[in-house]
Amino acid sequence: MKIRWIRLSLVAILIIAVVFIGVIGFQKYQFSKSRNKVIMQMDRLMKDQDGGNFRRLDKKENGVEIISYIPKTTEKKDNEIIQKEIGKATDAEVKKLNRDKETQGIIFYTYQKHRMAEQAISYKAVQSEYVKEGRTKFVLKDKKDICKNIVTDAETGALLTLGEVLIKSNQTKLNLKTAVEEELIKTGDFSLKDVGNLGKIKSLVKWNQTDFEITNSEIILPVKIPGAPEPKKVKVKLADIASSVNKRYLPSSVKVPEVPKAKTNKRIALTFDDGPSSSVTPGVLDTLKRHNVKATFFVLGSSVIQNPGLVKRELEEGHQVGSHSWDHPQLTKQSTQEVYNQILKTQKAVFDQTGYFPTTMRPPYGAVNKQVAEEIGLPIIQWSVDTEDWKYRNAGIVTKKVLAGATDGAIVLMHDIHKTTAASLDTTLTKLKSQGYEFVTIDELYGEKLQIGKQYFDKTDSRMVK
């Protein structure tokens, strides 16, 4: 009896052992199946994203599998920049592991790829960590970017700097600074009182910097804003700075807005300063509309605020709006910060009412020097015909001066704050029309993108500010 009991016990133990081994084996099978499934999913993800244009590297450290996907260039070579970033992340992770050799996990190093143009590719390397949950499956524990966005040449795989993607010039720096200021104004995060501080953004462009991102439509820059603890990523439309982008890296999908051009060879641009005025500007607009004439208004930001709706009407009726400062000081006698205040407050005032930023600027009294022109950050529009309407306050004299100075390509200076100027307009337009003139805005007069730091007097007379 005792022997029989012993035999039964041994059989039971054997059965339990077999079952235990079977369970363990099944768990290992399920675990292996789960592991293979995760790897297959990641392989499929990368093939779907990049068509298999990569090389997979596998290794094991401290019980953890590390699987890396290295992209290839158009020359079918490993992208050394991405490989280096993944290598640094791998080394750092291995140092942190210190896990028991029985601990099992998988760390994937993948990349997100975005072609910005035929000759440039934007990459971001990503780490995904899977760990064992229970005894039979893997689950995603953590996913994170392991490096900043990297822009490389599609052909060579070489890391691109901002100075290679953009055209190295002072004009590029000025264009980009103005574009960034406007994008920040659009956010609505800056009050009228504080918006001038955006002018303090300096050293925005460093030609050797690589910490930028680029898409098919935007370039994204980290910008240190005065008073802000961390840099802010600012998106600038490539179409807005297309003239400053190296053609090799400018996406063909970017549509650069065409500058309207005049239809005839006898053109004249009428311009009005110091408005809008609630008592005069509406009458000026009525007369222009009646004659189907377009003009350019250089507005004061303070007057835009005091007379809401008029600058919007100017734009809606097809006129161009430029800046004339906030409250008409001589900018060459102001501090740098005050120049920023004068310009950016006006930009914000016009944008808040219209969704539009003035693209040109006429400094009060025409006073400008090289430093102020760069601080303004907009092309400078001067004039070739001064009616001196502010001095004479006589409608007949205003008309006479316009007619005496009128030539093809002339820019005429008037003010839409004087009733005598408004009264002169009907006769002035009628007589100019009889002489065959086409009335154009400043943009139409030149028919091309104007330069920051340059001043324009008429169609044939433009020069860099000194």
Curated annotation (Swiss-Prot):
**From the Swiss-Prot or TrEMBL record, what is one GO molecular function term?**
lysozyme inhibitor activity
Which regions span the lipid bilayer? Answer: 6-26
Positions on the Cytoplasmic side per record topology: 1-5
Bilayer topology term? Single-pass membrane protein
* Residues at the active site: D273 (proton acceptor), H415 (proton donor)
Instruction: Give a single Pfam family match.
Output: Polysacc_deac_1
Which InterPro entries does the annotation name?
Answer: Glyco_hydro/deAcase_b/a-brl (IPR011330), NODB_dom (IPR002509), Peptidoglycan_deacetylase (IPR017219), Polysacc_deacetylase_ArnD (IPR050248)
Enzyme class (EC, first level): hydrolase
**Which superkingdom is the protein from?**
Bacteria
| Annotated substrate binding sites | Y365
Q: Which residues lie on this side of the membrane: Extracellular?
A: 27-466
How does the annotation summarize its subunit structure? Homodimer. Interacts (via transmembrane domain) with PbpA1 (via transmembrane domain); the interaction is important for the peptidoglycan N-deacetylase function of this protein.
- PANTHER family documented for this protein: CHITIN DEACETYLASE 1-RELATED, GLYCOSYL TRANSFERASE-RELATED
Name of the protein in question: Peptidoglycan-N-acetylglucosamine deacetylase PgdA
Q: Report the gene name.
A: pgdA
